[in-house]
Amino acid sequence: MLVYQDLLSGDELPSDSFSYTELGNGVLWEVQGKWVVQGAVDVNIGANPSAEGADEDEGVDDQAIKVVDIVDTFRLQEQPSFDKKQFVAYMKKYIKNLTPKLGAEQEEVFKNNIQGATKYLLSKLSDLQFFVGESMADDTGMVFAYYKDGATDPTFLYLAHGLKEVKC
């Protein structure tokens, strides 16, 4: 299995168990998330249900909750929304911190395409949710989520050049 770590914080963000689509010349990865129910346990011991009162809830609280698979799997932490000025400031700082960590070829592709990716994200700014990895480091890569028109499951956007592939 391949896991992709944030180059700046080392947090695990996506893995190859979630397929992605490249956007903006490979600068952004789009990954489809899903709402899943977690914690619901239905125990069937195979006994006679009518004798045991199968229709009765005997005070069992299984605390089933709905979570987004990607957020839960990688322990992403939601952050407050950004306005346009804050977002542009974040992107400038991110580019400044990430560029020295890239190889020459990767740096060239990143610099040539990050402006288009930033404009794309700015166009969706009011619809985006912002997440960071579990370390919640200050200068880290962000994961962006939004809902496509009519979708019930969120779509996540990753800045691909800020990810390092690690085999598990």
UniProtKB/Swiss-Prot annotation:
Protein keywords: Calcium, Cytoplasm
Domain named TCTP: residues: 1-168
Location within or outside the cell: Cytoplasm
A molecular function (GO) term: calcium ion binding
Induction behaviour: Expression is highly induced in the dark.
Entry function: Involved in calcium binding and microtubule stabilization.
Protein name: Translationally-controlled tumor protein homolog
